[in-house]
Amino acid sequence: MKETKILSIQVGLPKMLDEAETTNSTGKPWTTGIFKTAICAPVWVGKHNLIGDAQADLSVHGGTHKAVNVYPSEHYPYWRQELHLTEMPYGAFGENFTTCGLLEDEVCIGDVFKAGETIVQV
């Protein structure tokens, strides 16, 4: 079995972006939950989200069957190069878990993983 690691865990609360910060097509303020901060302690994973984490649009993010967002660290070098960035911290894509060794083409709906004491299912 291939080894998978969680390299970083991030949480964050929704933030209102004003006209100066927004890049959406309307130019109007909007709320997003994409901004995450790395934590260095165990975190409780519940049915709807991680403790200290929340989503802005619950119709498409968070809640039952959408509690944890995972993104592979293997994609970060591509995006740093594509966006001409020297730094891009884990969590930049709004993910809760930044992993190593867990790529999309190796994961199927229904797969079950153990993360510490938590069991998560895709």
Please describe what each predicted stretch is.
Residues 1-115, 119-122:
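Electropositive, beta-rich accessory/interaction domains or terminal extensions
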